[in-house]
Amino acid sequence: MNETIVVLLSIPGLRRQDVARMPRLAALARGGDQAALAPSFPAVTCPVQMNMTTGKLPREHGVVANGFYWRDRGEVEMWTAWNDVVQAPQIWDVLARERPGTTSAAWFGLLSKGCGADYVCTPAPIHNPDGSESLWCYTKPPELYGELRDTFDHFPLHHFWGPLANIASSEWIAASAVHAARTM
């Protein structure tokens, strides 16, 4: 049986000319197809990721920012909302409908908590009552993060964005994705 593998990578700031200096990514690109992305406005993480996973623009999928204002609670929620805020089918939803039996994964896409992908991993730190933070990831199935943590230690959230951002988070994401793909 011929197996088709589709990998959609979201690498902010990556330019086509940068790929040549990245041997593994260049090899992956040579083995498949590439498509240019024309970002929409606003060109921020959540709307652009939803553009990529739905094939729709913000006016159609409903995600117009990285945060959401919940009128009923009078609260702003940044980067942590669940997938039910997305108002258009995503690629894993279409695959499940059009190609039953296809396995899909959403790896470190924001707003992926509760999405229709078969496997999911995304940061979901636990904010404790004392103001401290416990490292954690939302995963589907729920026990997957325990396995990833046991294999790779906790996801290095503090190296994902902000002043301590560095390659450690990208290495964890790549290693965990490869591990999951090989063992799922």
Q: Locations of the language-model features?
A:
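A short catalytic or substrate-binding loop motif that flags glycine-/basic-rich loops and adjacent residues
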Residues: 1, 44, 170-172
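Short, structured active-site-proximal loop/turn typified by the sulfatase FGly-forming signature C/S-X-P-X-R
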Residues: 17-60, 103-105
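His/Asp/Glu-rich, glycine-adjacent segments
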Residues: 56-184
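Beta-strand elements within well-structured catalytic alpha/beta cores of enzymes
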Residues: 3-17, 28, 52, 95, ...
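Residue-level preference for short coil/turn positions at secondary-structure junctions
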Residues: 1-3, 30, 100
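An acidic- and aromatic-residue-enriched active-site/binding cleft used to recognize and process polar
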Residues: 13-14, 39, 109-112
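Generic recognition of stable, solvent-exposed alpha-helical segments in well-folded globular domains
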Residues: 9, 20-23, 90, 172
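Glycine-/proline-rich flexible loop or hinge segments
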Residues: 6-11, 30-35, 45-48, 67-80
